A protein has these predicted regions:
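Active-site cores that bind ATP or allylic diphosphates and position pyrophosphate for catalysis
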Residues: 101, 109-237, 243-250, 258, ...
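N-terminal Rossmann-like or analogous alpha/beta NTP/dinucleotide-binding catalytic cores
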Residues: 1-127, 218-230
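Residue-level signal for inorganic ion chemistry
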Residues: 27, 58, 102, 106, ...
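Conserved phosphate-binding loops in nucleotide/dinucleotide-binding enzymes
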Residues: 85-89, 184-185, 203-214, 242-275, ...
Length: 482
């Protein structure tokens, strides 16, 4: 049985967005599930769009997500694998060899036309109300190709192509999709249309998974496969990732972010991987969250949907919160090192882990950590609006609020052994003494001791703050309530 070999071939032209990550994830899952090989290839022939540092960001982002590759370039500048080079700019000689085969067969020709002449052809086709096809304007006696002009493919046969896509099913396109496209540009570098076909064959790629936008170009690719007399790999097109509105492809204007932005916001790679997999794929059950191991075991191309998958950032954040809750404390602590607020810098590890244990269930992203924990490390800024805008507390007069806080302070002061359990018993007693509902009394105590909208369980929060600090903050609140 032929070993499955898949690839991800990004261009170093900018940041890695979620669409690119999913384009890497699906072939990686297919390779890992079948004990195959996953190849990373850098398609860097478009030098006009090259961005310094973008290639290094590709390595960094894939590694962060947990996608490893068996062959290709590495971050240390070396390559692994026997089918290199894995940068297209270093494979010019290979492309020229394949181009010569087409020239010798009469299936490629030098393009002698200037941009102005091509525009005139376009205008002529438009005047005739016809689609512009370059093959209708082929030069009758093209010059010998010397490498300074573009080299064009001469479509050998104008026919309808039909192919089987494991995701989209049977697809076909007629002659209108076929044209004489450029193989080698005037700068000597190949176009994507030519290079990826040569590379996939040379690197023995068995399955190509790419976006649905490539469906329209597939007949051109198939005509080139025929001309080169090579068998195409399995060609699969995954659905578009749609904007939150669901009516167009996701773009920057729809709030699309780079993978690096999500990483800096505290999205876990496990959550991102599970979320990306769900954008167009499911296992046929109600399960929503998958570990890497589960995805490798369950991923199937025939479970990828044909229609576009709507991007829902709220769902990603929800999913991230679920993964955070499932981490053990030590693992979560290690991941939080870059996310603590500056007020936590001087705190010791034991105390920070105690704080993190309380905050864990409320964290949706690691970036939430400072807002949820700052009052454990420094004195919070008094914000009386938290009381004034609280639906329950604004029913009380300021004197009633102060009285409740004073009674609470007096009762809590009676606790000798300051533990969560004893504090909870005291809070229950306070409910009886004051004849108040928890939503009123506990909210008032929580705000007075943390000046935050949310906090962990009140008794646990007070226990970790300590008796002196808790009582001091209650007294300060009493003095500041007008």
């Amino acid at each position: 049985m032929t070993q499955i070999r898949t690839r991800f071939a990004p261009s170093p032209t900018g940041y890695i967005h979620v669409g690119s990550l999913r384009a890497a994830l699906f072939p990686w899952l297919l390779a890992r599930q079948n004990n195959g090989k996953f190849i990373l290839r850098i398609e860097d022939t478009d030098r006009s769009r090259f961005v310094e540092g973008a290639e290094e960001k590709i390595y960094e982002t894939l590694s962060w997500l947990g996608i490893d590759w068996d062959e290709g370039p590495t971050a240390n500048g070396k390559e692994k694998g026997k089918f290199g080079p894995y940068h297209q700019t270093e494979r010019r000689g290979i492309y020229l060899e394949w181009a010569k085969k087409l020239i010798d067969k009469g299936l490629a020709y030098a393009d002698p036309y200037t941009p102005e002449q091509v525009q005139a052809f376009r205008d002529e086709a438009k005047a005739k109300k016809e689609a512009f096809l370059y093959r209708n304007y082929r030069p009758k006696n093209p010059p010998k190709w010397d490498g300074t002009q573009p080299l064009r493919f001469k479509v050998p046969e104008i026919k309808r192509y039909t192919w089987q896509d494991p995701i989209m099913g049977e697809l076909s396109a007629g002659p209108e999709a076929l044209d004489d496209f450029i193989l080698i540009k005037s700068d000597g570098l190949p176009t994507y249309n030519f290079a990826h076909i040569v590379d996939d064959f040379e690197m023995e790629i068995t399955h190509v998974i790419r976006g649905a936008e490539y469906i329209a170009s597939t007949p051109r690719y198939l005509s080139l496969y025929d001309a080169l007399e090579i068998k195409p790999p399995v060609l699969a097109c995954s659905p578009h990732i749609m904007a939150p509105s669901g009516n167009k492809k996701l773009g920057k204007r729809d709030g699309a972010k780079s993978a690096d932005e999500y990483r800096k916001e505290g999205i876990l790679p496990e959550a991102m991987m599970s979320f990306l997999a769900s954008l167009g794929w499911n296992d046929g059950t109600e399960q929503e969250i998958f570990t890497k191991e589960e995805l490798i075991k369950k991923f199937k191309l025939d479970r990828v949907q044909k229609s576009g998958a709507r991007f829902d950032e709220k769902r990603l954040i929800w999913m991230n919160g679920q993964f955070i809750r499932n981490l053990n404390l030590d693992s979560l602590y290690e991941r939080c090192q870059l996310f603590w607020g500056k007020e936590a810098n001087s705190a010791d590890e034991i105390y920070k882990k105690q704080v993190l244990a309380l905050a864990q269930d409320r964290l949706k992203t690691l970036q939430d950590l400072p807002a949820l924990t700052s009052y454990f490390f420094s004195e919070p800024k008094i914000n009386l609006d938290l009381i004034l805008n609280n639906k329950q507390l604004k029913k009380l007069t300021s004197e009633e609020q102060k009285k409740l806080l004073q009674i609470s302070c007096d009762e809590l002061n009676k606790i000798n052994d300051w533990t969560s359990e004893n504090i909870q018993n005291c809070l229950n007693t306070l409910l009886e003494i004051t004849n108040q509902k928890p939503g009123i009394l506990f909210s008032l105590i929580r705000i007075a001791t943390t000046w935050a909208q949310f906090s962990p369980q009140l008794n646990d929060t007070l226990a970790l703050l300590g008796k002196d600090k808790s009582l001091d903050r209650l007294n300060i609140a009493i003095k500041n309530i007008a």
